[in-house]
């Protein structure tokens, strides 16, 4: 029954996308079908097949080992505030976001910058990009951008496509925006993992977002023009570093900007939510609903969607609330509020944990529209009106991609 509910959830999400399509007659069943199959296959390999699960677990273990080294830099700056005795001192509440999550982002961004400099990232992106281009029958630039989102965030995509921005047709531009919103960057992935989100789920979600973003981009805005972009040499940065030291330093400074942005936005929105909840609770108290909150309202509204995705009805309000927080605010705030349930074993069943983890894994939120419009407009001011028109539709496509990955994850966890 649960498995059939997951299948129903996939059908519901595809139906929503079809209804939102701007040109239903031009939908390519070849691309859409291949993207859906590939998204399911990646989920099955990493979540259900024993060899795939083994590889995912080993990679997750390696990521955790690498993350642990970030504590060395944190301890040098913050001393015992990142030590193991903090949990004992504060009775299990010694995890300090600013001392554990933000330094990890800086460390990993510097590490990724080094890997770009020595060519490792370029090789991976070219190999994966070629595979997805042929499998999905899409243009090279679409495949290139989609695969790059595994490592880079939506803020960096405009710099990647800048040399070709004038030759991108409307569909390619839309796909690039969708891919950025549907994914997460490698640096922020480490931040989510530090909050307790299973790394193997984050890895699987990142890979599934590649075909998922393309799937819903092509459903909502089918390709109607041929690609005009032709290139052999792909560049990942406008001014490549001249040494490995410069690469590390540049990456660290970029990581600092990301960490500062994360801290600022999280602090601001947590405060705003607290204010809104205070107002809602105060007004609700007049009518006997003193415990009403923004989370509870959003949870009730999205609970049916969470249920059809595979979440048990008893947890549907929580799942709906977290999905709503991710959409209205951002994924970091949603993961931050999800974290306490991950720290306490047995609070949620494995399937619910998987579905929520996948559903929140993406940059798709209303704030991202402003980020995308601002970032793309900076490199192509003359296309700003066009980009602004695509923003809301891209948000819908990216959100559906995240929810589809979550539904597929629930399907395979239910089979395990």
Locate the predicted segments by residue.
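Structural signature of hydrophobic alpha-helical transmembrane segments
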Residues: 1-11, 100, 292-294, 356-366
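Hydrophobic alpha-helical hairpins/lids featuring a short glycine-rich hinge
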Residues: 68-138
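Transmembrane helical segments that form the transport core of multi-pass membrane transport proteins
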Residues: 253-344
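Juxtamembrane inter-helical linkers in multi-pass membrane proteins
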Residues: 126-160, 226-247, 294-298, 326-327
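Hydrophobic core segments of alpha-helical transmembrane domains in multi-pass membrane transport
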Residues: 10-20, 35-47, 105-114, 183-191, ...
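Alpha-helical membrane segments and immediately flanking helix-loop junctions
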Residues: 135-193, 320-408
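Interfacial/capping segments of alpha-helical transmembrane domains
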Residues: 45-81, 227-230, 276-301, 314-322
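Long, contiguous bundles of hydrophobic transmembrane helices that form the permeation core
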Residues: 207-258
């Amino acid at each position: 029954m649960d498995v059939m509910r997951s299948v129903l959830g996939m059908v519901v999400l595809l139906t929503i996308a079809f209804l939102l399509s701007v040109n239903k007659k031009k939908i390519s069943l070849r691309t859409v079908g291949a993207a859906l199959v590939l998204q399911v296959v990646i989920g099955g390999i990493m979540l259900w097949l024993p060899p795939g699960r083994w590889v995912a677990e080993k990679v997750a273990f390696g990521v955790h080992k690498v993350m642990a080294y970030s504590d060395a830099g944190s301890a040098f700056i913050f001393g015992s505030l990142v030590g193991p005795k903090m949990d004992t001192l504060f009775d299990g509440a010694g995890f300090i976001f600013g001392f554990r999550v933000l330094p990890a982002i800086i460390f990993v961004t510097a590490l990724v910058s080094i890997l770009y400099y020595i060519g490792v990232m370029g090789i991976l992106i070219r190999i994966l990009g070629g595979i997805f281009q042929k499998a999905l029958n899409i243009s090279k630039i679409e495949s290139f951008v989609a695969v790059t989102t595994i490592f880079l965030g939506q803020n960096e995509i405009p710099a990647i496509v800048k040399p070709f921005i004038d030759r991108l047709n409307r569909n390619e531009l839309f796909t690039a925006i969708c891919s950025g919103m549907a994914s997460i960057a490698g640096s922020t992935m480490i931040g989510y993992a530090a909050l307790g989100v299973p790394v193997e789920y984050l890895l699987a979600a990142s890979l599934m977002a590649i075909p998922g973003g393309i799937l819903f981009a092509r459903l909502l805005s089918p390709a109607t023009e041929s690609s005009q972009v032709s290139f052999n040499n792909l560049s990942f940065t406008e001014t490549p570093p001249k040494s490995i030291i410069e690469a590390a330093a540049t990456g660290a400074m970029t990581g600092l900007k990301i960490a500062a942005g994360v801290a600022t936005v999280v602090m601001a929105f947590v405060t705003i939510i607290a204010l809104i909840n205070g107002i809602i609770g105060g007004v609700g108290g007049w009518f006997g609903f003193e415990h009403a909150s923004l989370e509870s309202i959003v949870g009730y509204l999205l609970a049916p969607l969470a249920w059809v995705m595979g979440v048990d009805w008893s947890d549907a309000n929580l799942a709906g609330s977290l999905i709503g927080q991710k959409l209205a605010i951002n994924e970091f705030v949603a993961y931050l509020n999800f974290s306490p349930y991950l720290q306490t074993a047995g609070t949620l069943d494995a399937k619910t944990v998987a579905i929520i983890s996948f559903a929140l894994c993406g940059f798709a939120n209303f704030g991202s529209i402003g980020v995308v419009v601002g970032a793309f407009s900076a490199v192509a001011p003359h296309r700003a009106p066009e980009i602004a028109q695509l923003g809301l539709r891209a948000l819908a496509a990216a959100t559906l991609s995240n929810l589809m990955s979550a539904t597929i994850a629930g399907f395979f966890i239910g089979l395990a």
